[in-house]
């Protein structure tokens, strides 16, 4: 028996806990920002725009008493405009299938019909913790108003517990971890203690480029795009990464590239800097644009993309 196996057994004998936690909610309630703060590192993309998360991202946080394996899901789509949205909703449902705890995120002082749609998808026999996010908003700073809002939402579903946080500012994140911990099963850790995600460097590079697309383009255009890593080469002291951005129309390609290529250059530069920080190495990044008409309704193609 090696030392890691022995120590893992000692942890389990001492009541160590480890389990899966799904983070769910309607689009744009701050799920990805919350997960990034929970694990202490940015691995899930964030944006003020809805539906920035398309793939389930697994983040891992480990301390001396528990290991939390968080699954960040796409926002549940109530507008089924195409096959892509249907696939995103399927991702949410699949993520809920094998978890030990569900964290249901809502925006402070704003509970909508879209939130209720998500509630109806939640498993009946899995503990669900209500998390009221964005308590830094002015309307949520009134303690009594916030308490009344939490009571209103708790009346909609049989929640195991509730917590109010500000994912943006990292407020009450430690409290939330302690709230989740008792609902995790006693188990040895599933991952090494220094591991923060099970996603590959290729996947993280793709997500970084997607985040920049959402940041620098208009309200609708990023939803008509997909990002593919065509090549990822790791050398001594340098990662060479080649990424294609897929769009539906030539007109979208022109918008993405921008006048004189300035917009694409800005997106590429900021993405490269973020990758160098995340991978702790120099990065050569090449980003270009491809046109494939109707890709968001092509079910076979979506499967090839892993969506």
From Swiss-Prot:
Region (G1): 25-32
G3: annotated span: 72-75
The UniProt record lists the keyword Ligase: no
Positions annotated to bind GTP: 25-32, 72-76, 133-136
Domain named Era-type G: residues: 17-186
Disulfide bonds: none
Membrane topology annotation: Peripheral membrane protein
GO cellular component entries: cytosol; plasma membrane
UniProt GO BP: ribosomal small subunit assembly
Keywords on record: Cell inner membrane, Cell membrane, Cytoplasm, GTP-binding, Membrane, Nucleotide-binding, Ribosome biogenesis, RNA-binding, rRNA-binding
Pfam families tied to this protein: KH_2, MMR_HSR1
Annotated localization: Cytoplasm; Cell inner membrane
UniProt xrefs under PROSITE patterns: G_ERA (PS51713), KH_TYPE_2 (PS50823)
Gene Ontology MF terms in the entry: GTP binding; GTPase activity; ribosomal small subunit binding; rRNA binding; small ribosomal subunit rRNA binding
Region annotation (G4) ranges: 133-136
KH type-2 domain location: 217-293
UniProt main location, coarse: cytoplasm
Region (G5): 165-167
Subunit structure: Monomer.
Function: An essential GTPase that binds both GDP and GTP, with rapid nucleotide exchange. Plays a role in 16S rRNA processing and 30S ribosomal subunit biogenesis and possibly also in cell cycle regulation and energy metabolism.
Family in the record: Belongs to the TRAFAC class TrmE-Era-EngA-EngB-Septin-like GTPase superfamily. Era GTPase family.
Identification of the protein by name: GTPase Era
Organism: Neisseria meningitidis serogroup B (strain ATCC BAA-335 / MC58)
Gene transcribed to yield this protein: era
């Amino acid at each position: 028996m090696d030392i890691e196996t022995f120590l893992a057994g000692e942890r389990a004998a001492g009541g160590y806990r480890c389990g899966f936690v799904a983070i769910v909610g309607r689009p744009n309630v701050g799920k990805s920002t919350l997960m990034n703060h929970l694990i202490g590192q940015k691995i899930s993309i964030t944006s003020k725009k809805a539906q920035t998360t398309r793939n389930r991202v697994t983040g891992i946080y480990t301390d001396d008493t528990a290991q939390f394996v968080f699954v960040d899901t796409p926002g549940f789509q109530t507008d089924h405009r195409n096959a892509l949205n249907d696939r995103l909703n399927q991702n949410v449902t699949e993520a809920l299938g094998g978890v030990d705890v569900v964290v249901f995120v809502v925006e402070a002082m704003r509970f909508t019909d879209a939130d209720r749609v998500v509630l109806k998808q939640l498993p009946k026999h899995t503990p669900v913790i209500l998390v009221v996010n964005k308590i830094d908003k002015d309307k949520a700073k009134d303690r009594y108003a916030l308490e009344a809002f939490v009571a209103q939402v708790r009346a909609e579903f049989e929640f195991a517990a509730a917590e109010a946080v500000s994912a943006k500012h990292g407020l009450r994140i430690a409290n939330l971890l302690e709230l989740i911990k008792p609902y995790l099963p006693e188990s040895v850790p599933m991952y090494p203690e220094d591991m923060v995600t099970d996603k590959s460097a290729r996947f993280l590079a793709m997500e970084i480029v997607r985040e920049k697309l959402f940041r620098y383009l208009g309200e609708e255009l990023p939803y008509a795009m997909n990002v593919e890593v065509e090549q990822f080469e790791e050398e001594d002291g340098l990662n060479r990464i080649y990424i294609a951005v897929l769009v539906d129309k030539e007109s979208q390609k022109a918008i993405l590239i921008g006048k004189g290529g300035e917009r694409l250059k800005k997106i590429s530069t900021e993405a490269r800097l973020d990758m160098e920080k995340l991978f702790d190495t120099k990065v050569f990044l090449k980003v270009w644009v491809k046109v494939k008409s109707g890709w968001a309704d092509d079910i076979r193609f979506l499967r090839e993309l892993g969506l």
